[in-house]
Amino acid sequence: MQSKKKKILVVDDEPDILEFLQEILEDEGYSVVTTDKGEYVEKLHDGGLPHLILLDMLLSGKDGRQIVKYLKSQEETKHIPVIMCSAHPSAEKTARAAGAEDFLAKPFEIDELLAKVAQYL
């Protein structure tokens, strides 16, 4: 359990995945903000910047790679680690090329998710 709550922004267009990830991460003591759209900028400022972003690669209306490129180009957000997720394991190279620090292939094991999150926090 984290002694100091770290904030994680989870961006995915599947409500079930958002709910699942929020529950798992909150059970581990993290503060979690979720959004189902790529309109991430608004969420970044709700209560301060997150310490980590979990980002689905394919969102309705927005490409996760574009979001990462934008985040990494901005002074205030370029330091925030981004873990991209996709149902296509072959997308890891693309995610890293876009600027993501790490990648999770869906479906993933809870232990794998928590280990990657802990690695960056």
Question: For each predicted feature, which ranges?
Answer:
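Short amphipathic alpha-helix used as the core "switch/output" element in two-component signaling
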Residues: 65-78
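Receiver (REC) domain switch/active-site region of two-component response regulators
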Residues: 109
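Alpha4 helix (beta4-alpha4-beta5 surface) of REC/receiver domains from two-component response regulators
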Residues: 63-66, 88-104, 112-115
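Hydrophobic residue at a beta-alpha junction
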Residues: 35-36, 59-62, 71
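Acidic, metal-coordinating helix/loop segments flanking the phosphotransfer/catalytic sites
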Residues: 34-52
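Hydrophobic/aromatic residues positioned on beta-strands within the core alpha/beta folds
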Residues: 83-85
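Active-site residues of response regulator receiver
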Residues: 56
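Two-component/phosphorelay signaling modules centered on CheY-like receiver
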Residues: 15-33
